[in-house]
Amino acid sequence: MSNLEESLRSLSLDFLNLLINGQAFSDVTFSVEGRLVHAHRCILAARSLFFRKFFCGTDSPQPVTGIDPTQHGSVPASPTRGSTAPAGIIPVNSVGYEVFLLLLQFLYSGQVSIVPQKHEPRPNCGERGCWHTHCSAAVDLALDTLAASRYFGVEQLALLTQKQLASMVEKASIEDVMKVLIASRKQDMHQLWTTCSHLVAKSGLPPEILAKHLPIDVVTKIEELRLKSSIARRSLMPHNHHHDLSVAQDLEDQKIRRMRRALDSSDVELVKLMVMGEGLNLDESLALHYAVESCSREVVKALLELGAADVNYPAGPAGKTPLHIAAEMVSPDMVAVLLDHHADPNVRTVGGITPLDILRTLTSDFLFKGAVPGLTHIEPNKLRLCLELVQSAAMVISREEGNNSNNQNNDNNTGIYPHMNEEHNSGSSGGSNNNLDSRLVYLNLGAGTGQMGPGRDQGDDHNSQREGMSRHHHHHQDPSTMYHHHHQHHF
């Protein structure tokens, strides 16, 4: 790193520390979602034309005067009815606390990370341990940041966010792509519009489905793109055959979407017909994983009884099986039906995590941390039952393997060694000790449920601002800690 780069980096961090430290030398305070954010007029005015005009237009903010970025003027908005902000504090409306801090972080330092904290529980992302690189939570945060940067006139941040969205939509769900498509149309972001419209055109969704999510003129343009693409493919057909792969992939995607709609409506018979008549591969289409996450126990049971799905099939880069997902959901019904159909409680993900590891970690979180954010939806009794089911299944498998090993040894050694009685076998194998340990865990979990208050008390606004900044300032985490540290960062 050159001396110039080092100097600029140091300058950026120095300014960012002013924001992180909150009240140090602060001369303006904002109220966002009931939380105070301390800042510095000179920095905001120097970095944003909006704030420059805002501060020039009001020498001393009145209690009911606020900033509303949905008002397109660059002066203080009209008084906010019902505002309860104390004198000297400027209420900010229509922008969330997290997005406002990201905006200020960029204004102070020129740098920002517009993604949620890795593995952080988010209300619009149901996957435990998600890295939030292209899920709905990541897309929504980027869209909110883009809107705020446009409203406050921070064009550099808007360009940075557009680039990030362009990379996100390549892997995002089609629903999220359509959200970005609508936003790019409203804000005249032509490159992002082009990227998203082509992705939607290739999705294979029929016009009647698109019309439920998109304006009719947008649907018309999508259909025009499809027509042009179809003509282009036909013109290349004598010379190219790679389009066959694309067509086959489109057909496979459509097949998977039909399968999921059938599962959503509990129509397992239709799925059976697709397997028999259309060659649908339930494993590659992750049918069982989807059913465990989104459907009822009866649907999962019926799907397993078709005999066409591998109950231990690993999915995605992490290699999670349906039992891993059921353990993360803390669903005794799903755990039980999967174990009934020979799901392996000892199967490991790519990171070496078993379903039992997941449940033990969740139990530990309850015992030692209390009801922390991300675990509040989990019922302790269900967690205890899931742990008991998976642990019992693991012990049964262990005993069967031990018996098979003993039988093999007995066949190989005809009477040379005396047989050990069952009591001695079970004691020496550690089975009773494991059972005792598991009972202690159950007792502790049950006893702890009465004390599961908040994980920590609310700090003051100064500490809250420091924590809010830290969530997006420290973003590196060891993937091996996916299950043991995913509840560290919360407000």
Swiss-Prot record:
Repeat as a keyword? yes
What Gene3D superfamilies does the database record attribute to this sequence? Ankyrin repeat-containing domain (1.25.40.20), Potassium Channel Kv1.1, Chain A (3.30.710.10)
Biased region (Basic and acidic residues) positions are 457-470
Q: Where is this region: Disordered?
A: 400-491
Q: Where are the zinc fingers (C2HC NPR-type)?
A: 122-136
Membership in a protein family: Belongs to the plant 'ANKYRIN-BTB/POZ' family. 'NOOT-BOP-COCH-like' (NBCL) subfamily.
Which taxonomic lineage is given here? Answer: Eukaryota, Viridiplantae, Streptophyta, Embryophyta, Tracheophyta
- Name of the protein this chain belongs to: Regulatory protein NPR5
Per UniProt, residues of the BTB domain are: 26-116
Per UniProt, where does Zn(2+) bind? C125, C130, H132, C135
Annotated pathway: Protein modification; protein ubiquitination
In terms of superkingdom, the source organism counts as Eukaryota
Summarize tissue expression.
Answer: Highly expressed in young floral meristem. Predominantly expressed in the boundary between floral meristem (FM) and sepal primordia.
Keywords in alphabetical order: ANK repeat, Cytoplasm, Metal-binding, Nucleus, Repeat, Ubl conjugation pathway, Zinc, Zinc-finger
Q: Indicate whether Cell membrane appears among the record's keywords.
A: no
- Segments of skewed composition (Low complexity): 403-413
Native organism is Arabidopsis thaliana (Mouse-ear cress)
